[in-house]
Amino acid sequence: MSELSRRRFLYLSGGAAATAAGVGVWAALLRGESEKGILVPPSTTLGGTSSTTSTTTTAATTTSVPTPPQNPVVVIVQMDGGNDGLNTLVPLDGIYHDARPTLALSDSDLISLTGINDFGLHPALAPLSEFWDKEMLKIVAGSGIPEQGRSHFAATDAWHSARTDKEETGWIGRWLDATEGSTPNPLRGIALGGGASILTGKSSISTVIKSPSNFRLATPPGTDSESIVLAFLNTASPLASEPALAAAQSAIPNSLDAIGVINSAKSEANPDPYAEESFTSLLETAAGLINMNLDTRVIVISVPGFDTHANQLGRHQDLLTDFMTGVSNFWNRIESDGHADRVLLMSTSEFGRRVEENGSSGTDHGAASVQFLIGPGKGLYGNFDLRNLVKGDLPITLDTRSAYATALDWLGGPTDEILGDSYSRLF
């Protein structure tokens, strides 16, 4: 199909149905098409090497390496905007309180972790202590990528690509490329709410749905949806001689399948098709997708709002409450469905916040932050070094690519080749 491949067309069309799909030609029948789903395009470059940062363990960890499960799944939960690590995993340190006279959380309100004397969790994260006691929680304090910067765009690019140069592929996209079978499956990598660039590969296709609750055919009043579907399918053959149109035609059946799959997962998890997109809602959909046994290997969940320059305390409380509710419900669901032993959940955010609060009851862009990994084993890695700040920022004490390497080992594949170097693992 000439140089305008079907895969590339689907990206350029920017359409809504995203199994292998874009189909912008048909977007008039899709509600808010550009916001609902886009294909992650293949890229043209593959990255080189990165520097390593050694792990500093500040608490006893479970040391046994888990046996890789069959059909492993990694769920990446992105706190978009730059989560304030210091008010998430709170140091029991006077320097923290001095730097944040109005934002510092009271030591007495924090959630303690057995065996940890230097930190407490934000009160909204109380259920994480249960994961800790069950040896299912790893915490990375001071996580980041050296030279990631304070720009949302630059830092997000660094976190998604696992590089600080102009790499155009995502680290998960490179894994999808490396493990792609003879029959492409665009549901192996799915992003809900955003996070497209982390799935970008050279050859693999992934699915990105901005809003699962709105990912559906928008039929006019009085119109039979089955008739619309048949009309779509009737236009899929014979293929036109013009490459772009033929590419759109070829995508139609898979596009319709994608709508059915996502809506089935959504309705199975939450009967309200118009529920607000949130960690809770998106993770419910993710649990439904895992239970459908679609050979999905990576699900990326993205929720904005963590750029807390002003009025942080209440907003951050609400965001972490939603995060924790979503994670708890998700884990309860996959345990009930019998999938928990093959799932590793990892939180990310493109950077942390500055140590000192600003004059607007908030915090500005910083450097190091915190990550959580829920799965086998427990431990606290890295540290918040409040006594050796770098231009007012927490220094990065553990490269997040150690967490990435741990996740890639869980999935199976050429971890060091994908990351461009060898990084210490968290198990």
What are these regions (language model features)?
Residues H365-G366:
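Conserved active-site-proximal phosphate/metal-binding subdomains
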Residues S2-D337, E356, V370-I374, K378-F427:
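Feature for exported/extracytoplasmic and membrane-associated proteins, marking the mature portion
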Residues A340:
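Conserved H-loop
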